[in-house]
């Protein structure tokens, strides 16, 4: 893809998301979603091959269906209230229709089937955009709609997402699929606390995006896409491999890393609102996520694969890739826990 075309496409993707974030008019929000969806497809197919085309087609069909449902909800809301404003969405049927549409866009369970397949079929850079930037616009609309949404529907989808995110990643060897299932689980945690503390959801989103960006950048740095290729990099790039494992444990929510903060605060918020059983179920299923990250860490760091001396010296001759954002992302992804008392005063 030529640089000018790529710049135009990226500008359209960013403009679509910003339009959704800044609008309180349903038609402008829908147009922003469509701009974003149509512009992201060439990015998904940046490396043109059959798997990328299949992934982009699955993504397009899912997002088009979600956009159709969203437009149906917008029209129903217009007929019932005569208004285009987001905050006028008070009818339960309209609210549920829009919630389902946005859940499809986010990849929440039971509409999660496209997320692992699409993420696996596209390059690492495209996967990074899909699992971070593409989550911002739908979550911003859910944030605005939080007072009028059905809490039982949200909690059901949240529980299913956390369960699917943990269960689905157990037997995976592809790193992109593991991150896709981790994304589903994180979305579940965000949706669970949406009706009780929408601001806490934003904290969870920011920490999730930071950790996922750092993980994808490290994967791109050492060109790892499978657990086998990751385990073989221990001899070549020991420091980078160690950082990958620490960030992945943070994604799993292991204390004292940054990924533990949102889970801790969400558990506190849910128990404060007497959601004891739901919190217990979510906490138990979150252990599945932590388990497959710890298993990956054990296989990579504590079991050394046979290697030659030439392989061990190979890292000295590799050209280094310039990733300026990597050090701050790694620090934020691992060392934010001491700031928790200050954060707790804000939510």
From Swiss-Prot:
<keyword id="KW-1278">Translocase</keyword>
<feature type="transmembrane region" description="Helical">
    <location>
        <begin position="3"/>
        <end position="23"/>
    </location>
</feature>
<feature type="transmembrane region" description="Helical">
    <location>
        <begin position="67"/>
        <end position="87"/>
    </location>
</feature>
<dbReference type="GO" id="GO:0008137">
    <property type="term" value="F:NADH dehydrogenase (ubiquinone) activity"/>
</dbReference>
<feature type="transmembrane region" description="Helical">
    <location>
        <begin position="237"/>
        <end position="257"/>
    </location>
</feature>
<keyword id="KW-0812">Transmembrane</keyword>
<keyword id="KW-1133">Transmembrane helix</keyword>
<keyword id="KW-0472">Membrane</keyword>
<protein>
    <recommendedName>
        <fullName>NADH-ubiquinone oxidoreductase chain 2</fullName>
        <ecNumber>7.1.1.2</ecNumber>
    </recommendedName>
</protein>
<dbReference type="InterPro" id="IPR003917">
    <property type="entry name" value="NADH_UbQ_OxRdtase_chain2"/>
</dbReference>
<keyword id="KW-0679">Respiratory chain</keyword>
<dbReference type="Pfam" id="PF00361">
    <property type="entry name" value="Proton_antipo_M"/>
</dbReference>
<comment type="function">
    <text>Core subunit of the mitochondrial membrane respiratory chain NADH dehydrogenase (Complex I) which catalyzes electron transfer from NADH through the respiratory chain, using ubiquinone as an electron acceptor. Essential for the catalytic activity and assembly of complex I.</text>
</comment>
<dbReference type="GO" id="GO:0005743">
    <property type="term" value="C:mitochondrial inner membrane"/>
</dbReference>
<feature type="transmembrane region" description="Helical">
    <location>
        <begin position="323"/>
        <end position="343"/>
    </location>
</feature>
<comment type="subunit">
    <text>Core subunit of respiratory chain NADH dehydrogenase (Complex I) which is composed of 45 different subunits. Interacts with TMEM242.</text>
</comment>
<keyword id="KW-0999">Mitochondrion inner membrane</keyword>
<keyword id="KW-0496">Mitochondrion</keyword>
<feature type="transmembrane region" description="Helical">
    <location>
        <begin position="274"/>
        <end position="294"/>
    </location>
</feature>
<comment type="similarity">
    <text>Belongs to the complex I subunit 2 family.</text>
</comment>
<feature type="transmembrane region" description="Helical">
    <location>
        <begin position="150"/>
        <end position="170"/>
    </location>
</feature>
<feature type="transmembrane region" description="Helical">
    <location>
        <begin position="201"/>
        <end position="221"/>
    </location>
</feature>
<dbReference type="InterPro" id="IPR050175">
    <property type="entry name" value="Complex_I_Subunit_2"/>
</dbReference>
<keyword id="KW-0249">Electron transport</keyword>
<keyword id="KW-0813">Transport</keyword>
<dbReference type="GO" id="GO:0006120">
    <property type="term" value="P:mitochondrial electron transport, NADH to ubiquinone"/>
</dbReference>
<dbReference type="InterPro" id="IPR001750">
    <property type="entry name" value="ND/Mrp_TM"/>
</dbReference>
<dbReference type="Pfam" id="PF06444">
    <property type="entry name" value="NADH_dehy_S2_C"/>
</dbReference>
<dbReference type="GO" id="GO:0032981">
    <property type="term" value="P:mitochondrial respiratory chain complex I assembly"/>
</dbReference>
<dbReference type="InterPro" id="IPR010933">
    <property type="entry name" value="NADH_DH_su2_C"/>
</dbReference>
<feature type="transmembrane region" description="Helical">
    <location>
        <begin position="25"/>
        <end position="45"/>
    </location>
</feature>
<keyword id="KW-0520">NAD</keyword>
<feature type="transmembrane region" description="Helical">
    <location>
        <begin position="178"/>
        <end position="198"/>
    </location>
</feature>
<keyword id="KW-0830">Ubiquinone</keyword>
